[in-house]
């Protein structure tokens, strides 16, 4: 028998009352947690994501934060147009669209041989390259060392950052930061809202966050990817050179590689610090120019912008183990090194599939931006002691599997 109208109304009122009180309880509890824990950055994070129907950071977050502007070059490098016509196959197009690709560009030498955009993303659109910015920071470190502002790769961090002069931190060097082997206790999770990564993205005190980290293992022993290392490098550059990071980036690289558009770097607050571990916004074509600089081992128009010795050192992988307990073949001085194919690929990488791939043997640069990526190739638990399996896949482990597809597409277009 169905409920009478009066009983139904009472039931609806009761349901709404319980729902309202539940929501009120959750809001009060969340606010109490934020206030008592001091994690006020969560307000910014919630307002920038969940209240806008998003679950996390996106490539178009530029106006969510205050930012610095890095002016484009006065002498723009014009890409030549390829005389040949290339296109994606239906299968490749489907692959790109399934991963919400926003741009895919292929350059060979001085020529732009393929360029495609999706949705509202166009050639003038700037997007966040996320952690691909880490490699940009590394190039700036190389310049600062070569010019004598930073003494050497093996200079203690404490020379520039006072909080690292005492205790276990005084053993950490610039090289350790670049190799992601500092031994610091940094929470890198991109999904955990309570991680150091989340606080660094939405918070307003980057210096306080990175200098308060504790040492939990001996530096230089294990590869452990941490965005805090990159941020410390940025502070070292500023302390050593006396210049703001964005100004230094403009003077030493961005103005010298023929960039066509301004770039933007998110700050932690008004007149604050650049989020050097991520959050550099630029156009896909300008990211291609950065890839070309890497491809040419730091040289542009016959001039050595980044020292050659540093570019060669940058792509070496040190004799240390990864978290899987295998030799590190994947990461040099803040640059990814893929040696699982026929020829080496050196690349900048950011979450959600931001890539600037340089393939020296093909004189090739590939830029991909978008909002999704595939998972990293990881070591299955049951294969950890299988030496044959490890030998076969050790140079692919830790790389996102989609780069293999992008490399394949780029190489197909240059045959």
Language-model segments: what does each one mean?
Residues 2-121, 150, 398, 403-415:
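N-terminal leader/targeting segments and the immediately adjacent pre-domain N-terminus
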Residues 261, 315-365:
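Active-site Gly/Thr loop motif
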Residues 98-101, 125, 351-352:
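Short, small/polar residue-rich loop motifs at catalytic or cofactor-binding pockets
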Residues 15, 31-40, 48, 348-415:
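Structured C-terminal helix/loop/strand segments within mature extracytoplasmic catalytic/sensor domains
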Residues 110, 127-153, 177, 233-237, ...:
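Active-site SXXK
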Residues 186-268:
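A small/polar active-site loop signature that marks catalytic segments
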Residues 147-185, 212, 239-278, 282:
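Active-site helix/loop module of the DD-peptidase/beta-lactamase fold
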Residues 229-236, 276-299, 354-371:
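Active-site-proximal alpha-helical segments within enzyme catalytic domains
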């Amino acid at each position: 028998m169905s409920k009478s109208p009066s009983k139904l109304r009472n039931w609806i009122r009761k349901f709404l009352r319980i729902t309202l009180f539940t929501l009120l309880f959750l809001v009060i509890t969340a606010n109490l947690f934020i206030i008592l824990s001091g994690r006020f950055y969560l307000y910014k994070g919630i307002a920038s994501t969940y209240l806008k129907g998003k679950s996390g950071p996106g490539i178009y977050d530029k106006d969510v934060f205050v930012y610095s502007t890095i002016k484009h070059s006065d002498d723009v490098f014009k890409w030549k147009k390829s005389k040949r016509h290339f296109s994606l196959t239906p299968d490749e197009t489907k692959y790109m669209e399934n991963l919400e690709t926003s741009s895919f560009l292929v350059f060979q030498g001085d020529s732009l041989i393929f360029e495609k955009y999706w949705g509202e993303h166009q050639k003038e659109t700037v997007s966040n390259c996320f952690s691909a910015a880490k490699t940009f920071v590394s190039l700036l470190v190389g310049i600062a060392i070569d010019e004598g502002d930073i003494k050497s790769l093996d200079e203690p961090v404490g020379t520039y950052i006072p909080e690292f002069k005492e205790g276990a931190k005084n053993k950490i060097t610039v090289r350790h930061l670049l190799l992601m082997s500092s031994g610091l206790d940094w929470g890198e999770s991109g999904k955990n809202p309570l991680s150091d990564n989340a606080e660094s993205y939405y918070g307003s005190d980057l210096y306080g966050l990175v200098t308060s980290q504790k040492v939990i293992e001996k530096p230089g022993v294990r590869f452990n990817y941490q965005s805090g290392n990159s941020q410390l490098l940025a502070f070292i550059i500023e302390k050593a050179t006396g210049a703001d990071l964005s100004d230094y980036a403009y003077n030493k690289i961005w103005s010298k590689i023929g960039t066509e558009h301004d770039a933007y770097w998110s700050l932690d607050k008004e007149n604050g610090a650049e989020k050097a571990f991520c959050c550099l916004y630029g156009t896909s074509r300008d990211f291609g120019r950065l890839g070309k600089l890497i491809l040419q081992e730091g040289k542009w128009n016959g001039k050595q912008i980044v020292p050659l010795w540093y570019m060669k050192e940058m792509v070496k992988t040190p004799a240390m183990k990864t978290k899987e307990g295998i030799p590190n073949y994947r990461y040099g001085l803040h640059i990814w090194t893929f040696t699982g194919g026929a020829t080496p690929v050196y690349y900048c990488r950011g979450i959600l599939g931001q890539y600037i791939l340089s393939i020296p043997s093909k004189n090739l640069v590939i830029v991909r931006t978008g909002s999704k990526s595939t998972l990293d190739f990881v070591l299955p638990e049951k294969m950890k002691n299988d030496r044959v399996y490890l030998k076969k896949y050790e140079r692919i482990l830790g790389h996102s599997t989609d780069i293999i597809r992008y490399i394949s597409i780029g190489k197909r277009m240059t045959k």
